[in-house]
Curated annotation (Swiss-Prot):
<dbReference type="GO" id="GO:0008270">
    <property type="term" value="F:zinc ion binding"/>
</dbReference>
<dbReference type="InterPro" id="IPR001628">
    <property type="entry name" value="Znf_hrmn_rcpt"/>
</dbReference>
<feature type="cross-link" description="Glycyl lysine isopeptide (Lys-Gly) (interchain with G-Cter in SUMO)">
    <location>
        <position position="315"/>
    </location>
</feature>
<dbReference type="GO" id="GO:0008283">
    <property type="term" value="P:cell population proliferation"/>
</dbReference>
<feature type="DNA-binding region" description="Nuclear receptor">
    <location>
        <begin position="37"/>
        <end position="113"/>
    </location>
</feature>
<comment type="function">
    <text>Orphan nuclear receptor of retinal photoreceptor cells. Transcriptional factor that is an activator of rod development and repressor of cone development. Binds the promoter region of a number of rod- and cone-specific genes, including rhodopsin, M- and S-opsin and rod-specific phosphodiesterase beta subunit. Enhances rhodopsin expression. Represses M- and S-cone opsin expression.</text>
</comment>
<dbReference type="GO" id="GO:0003700">
    <property type="term" value="F:DNA-binding transcription factor activity"/>
</dbReference>
<feature type="region of interest" description="Disordered">
    <location>
        <begin position="127"/>
        <end position="157"/>
    </location>
</feature>
<keyword id="KW-0863">Zinc-finger</keyword>
<keyword id="KW-0539">Nucleus</keyword>
<keyword id="KW-0862">Zinc</keyword>
<dbReference type="GO" id="GO:0042462">
    <property type="term" value="P:eye photoreceptor cell development"/>
</dbReference>
<dbReference type="Pfam" id="PF00104">
    <property type="entry name" value="Hormone_recep"/>
</dbReference>
<dbReference type="InterPro" id="IPR050274">
    <property type="entry name" value="Nuclear_hormone_rcpt_NR2"/>
</dbReference>
<feature type="zinc finger region" description="NR C4-type">
    <location>
        <begin position="76"/>
        <end position="101"/>
    </location>
</feature>
<dbReference type="GO" id="GO:0000978">
    <property type="term" value="F:RNA polymerase II cis-regulatory region sequence-specific DNA binding"/>
</dbReference>
<dbReference type="Pfam" id="PF00105">
    <property type="entry name" value="zf-C4"/>
</dbReference>
Amino acid sequence: MSSTVAASTMPVSVAASKKESPGRWGLGEDPTGVGPSLQCRVCGDSSSGKHYGIYACNGCSGFFKRSVRRRLIYRCQVGAGMCPVDKAHRNQCQACRLKKCLQAGMNQDAVQNERQPRSMAQVHLDAMETGSDPRSEPVVASPALAGPSPRGPTSVSATRAMGHHFMASLITAETCAKLEPEDAEENIDVTSNDPEFPASPCSLDGIHETSARLLFMAVKWAKNLPVFSNLPFRDQVILLEEAWNELFLLGAIQWSLPLDSCPLLAPPEASGSSQGRLALASAETRFLQETISRFRALAVDPTEFACLKALVLFKPETRGLKDPEHVEALQDQSQVMLSQHSKAHHPSQPVRFGKLLLLLPSLRFLTAERIELLFFRKTIGNTPMEKLLCDMFKN
């Protein structure tokens, strides 16, 4: 098992291995016997195309990109630098995986020189502003957001642009704070030092690590919302303290939808040990599984998730707010966004908007105290959740 020991320049020992012979990876026998099929030259999994100079799978290309961009240094815990790197073992030693990426011919310069992709939010916004998206509708901004403006065409266009930018900011925040199943899988394994028992999303350490990352992403999502960061700082903290548990559950549901089941709901016996983690009661597990099934049945898309998160975050009834009117305007705007997106992208489902709103009460089935106890107590100990959230938010 590997562990991250620093964030600096790429280690010389690993970088030097790039000069070694890449070996004969890349072509495997087609199970049909017709001919060779493309394989990942790093782990042997099915290749999704050329990445950074070689044929590779999404998992290995993503791992290589993150390692280079973050300038991570890994240390082989076994010490020999000869750990197996195949589809079944690729997450066991990050040092050997990175070494094999370089040996196979992946180019670090291709990562560093890669153009950052334009966010989907900006693409969507540009399309709306140029009128190239026939499905887009004029977005009505809340008066409290738009503020007083002169009558006439100018005020209409300004209102529409404000609505477009609100939607764009939601989608941008969603893109910047998205945790993929593959990301969690690869980052979880740094929490264990035992090469024989790598942490996985279903292990005890994996559950706690994934929970912490999902909470961090929820806070990051809120911080990336300009309309949220424009609120008084005290209001931001109060809203986050009020909504963190629902944002965490929404993030966990969104993360688990592509998976067969949610690893966070794994029973203690499947997690390696029940010690240190209280088990979800059977009724709680069943209810959460049913909730995830409802999200899956509706095939909730990223934009809808973003709007639902905004509705959960912007609660004007939260006690202690300095500017509840502004928060209420943001909540109204979030509903407008969700309604118009549903009509534009799912015209054959006239009741979809209502069904999406009816998903929200299920997020309050587990109290914040219960979620903290089940998923975070071992990680944070006696540290108050409010302090953890504040530290995450400030950093």
